């Protein structure tokens, strides 16, 4: 078992599937995930039509997600929960309409080539920096593809490298947000939009709903600089350790039939056992589809791994790798 679970789980019969009328601060319920993660609605922002979900158990206890109200059906609430008046529900529906415009950015091979040139140039700088400053290399360490944890010296190297590039705040925010929930709030959405504009992935989703998504440290120019610098660091350290590609695994269970995976960021793992834990292949499983697969992937398509990312070794032990998926495999 790789994740915390309820000792005794309450029956779904005590709950009702979430609807807009349940978006009332204080309402308690659970996420409709496999382990029924409990929490409550802490607040609701009328302008963005997003609610704060405060988690009350498991690894992320005390932390919160920012969730669009349209996803309320992914939650369940106690049957005695407070409900909104119909007029307030209609107001939410009306406000949500302005966020239903879709933004589509297909993969551009021309933009991808330009970005790769930038990364190649930055990799030379990252390689020189690592040779001069890396505690990981000075201690004669290498990346062990069978390791269960990352390395503190490599965490430190990444941190110092990001400081030298003026990008540490982006690294910390991106790593923590991806660990907590990449679909919470709009920080990762902003990253995906910039990645798509750079040709790294495609973006096919809704327009941003928060005004500050591309302000402060999140301006597009700084986000792109971060994306290039991080890719360069990963390529440099893996190449210095003699790795051109890495063995990865992915496991998945779903309540819906399999569908084509788009060109986007995809979570994978270096551990076969972790991948198997995400694939409910036993006869008692109620999922409609599942799989687990092993594949080799070029280090050029890695975004984050547990080797250099401290946050990926704290609350969860999943030996995770986030990849730029460009339809080179069939999931």
Question: Language-model segments: what does each one mean?
Answer:
Residues 2-8, 12-13, 19-27, 43, ...:
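Mono-ADP-ribosyltransferase
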């Amino acid at each position: 078992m790789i994740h915390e679970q309820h000792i005794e789980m309450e029956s779904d019969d005590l709950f009702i599937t979430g609807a807009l009328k349940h978006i009332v601060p204080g309402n308690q319920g659970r996420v409709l995930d496999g382990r029924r993660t409990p929490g409550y609605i802490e607040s609701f922002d009328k302008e963005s039509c997003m609610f704060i979900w405060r988690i009350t158990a498991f690894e992320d206890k005390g932390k919160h997600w920012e969730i669009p109200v349209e996803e309320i059906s992914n939650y369940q609430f106690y049957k005695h929960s407070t409900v909104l008046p119909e007029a307030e529900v209609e107001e939410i529906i009306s406000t949500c309409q302005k966020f239903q415009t879709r933004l589509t950015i297909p993969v551009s091979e021309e933009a991808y080539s330009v970005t790769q040139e930038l990364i190649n140039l930055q990799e030379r700088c990252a390689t020189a920096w690592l040779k001069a400053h890396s505690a990981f290399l000075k201690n004669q360490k290498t990346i062990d593809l069978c390791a269960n944890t990352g390395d503190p010296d490599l965490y430190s190297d990444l941190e110092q490298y990001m400081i030298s590039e003026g990008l540490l705040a982006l690294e910390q925010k991106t790593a923590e947000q991806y660990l907590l929930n990449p679909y919470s709030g709009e920080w990762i959405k902003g990253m995906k939009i910039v990645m798509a504009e750079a040709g790294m992935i495609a973006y096919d989703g809704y327009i941003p709903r928060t005004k500050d998504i591309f302000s402060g440290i999140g301006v597009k120019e700084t986000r792109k600089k971060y994306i290039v610098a991080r890719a360069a660091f990963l390529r440099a350290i893996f190449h210095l350790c003699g790795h051109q590609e890495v063995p990865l695994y992915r496991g998945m269970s779903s309540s819906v039939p399999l569908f084509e995976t788009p060109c986007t960021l995809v979570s994978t793992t270096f551990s076969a056992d972790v991948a198997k834990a995400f694939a409910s292949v036993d006869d008692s499983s109620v999922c409609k589809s599942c799989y687990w697969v092993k594949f080799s992937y070029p280090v050029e398509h890695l975004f984050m791994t547990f080797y250099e990312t401290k946050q990926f070794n704290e609350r969860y032990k999943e030996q995770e790798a986030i990849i730029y998926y460009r339809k080179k495999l069939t999931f």
